Amino acid sequence: VKWGLVSLVFLLVTGTGCFFVVYHSLHSASKDMHSPIDRDVSAKRDDQVSFDEKDPFSVLLLGIDEREGDAGRSDTMIVLTVNPDKKKTTLLSIPRDTYAEISGRGDKNKINHAYAYGGVKMAMETVEHMLDIPLDYYIKVNMEGFEDMIDVLGGVKVTNSLAFESGGYRFPVGDLVLNGKQALSYTRMRQDDPDGDFGRQERQREIIQSVLRQGSSLSTILNTGDILQSLGENVKTNLTFNQLIDIQNDYRQAADHIEQISLDAGTNKYINGIYFYVIPEETIAAVQKVLRGELELY
């Protein structure tokens, strides 16, 4: 799911071949997607990011599992920094069970609870506090939208290295073509993986590569209307249409070098009978240093 979410972002910001073909359609879809939050600039910035000056910027990607009568939790939390001068994009996936201080509540809990307690704004502020960086923008996707996107693309191709069953589907070793529901199950499995959540992230990395390949194909261009409808229905962001255009024009070379960093030095602990993923302070400090460097916050 994480990588399906990231792929939606890259389809927006790195300029697939269909971008200019569907300029006006994207404008319409972006109006449906646009959902500002109650702040103009992060408390960790003095000034707003300037796309005209090609400032580095950051995005919090949220994959939300919302059910009827439930505010939902962010099953996916990814921080993305984009630096056009370095021609580099950095991705940090935050394990959903991470033990963290929840902004505005004065207590610690699983970091994915922040969204359930206070929506996008509290989720952003919680991650900002943990990583000591500003989060300039967010992109939120309904998990059901991930299914829709995969299906519109005609499925995704993966090479599976671990035979397992998940969500009622069997995934044998070898080359597979997955539809949306299968892809969700493929990316959610972690209990039977010897590498746990990090094994799941490896499968998710493969999903994004497949989605990006499909996203730049001729068949995708011909199905652009369906893709944009899926985006408009399932994706929300505080990025405006003009900002998306600026990113497409001036930042797409940042996708030339995509680096993933991780928080894999944590340990599994039970605190008051509840399972958490506890990350050492020195690990968080090291990640803070990397991300602040990418945002040129010295």
Per-range role (PLM):
Residues V1-F10, T14-Y298:
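Non-catalytic, solvent-exposed segments at the cell envelope interface
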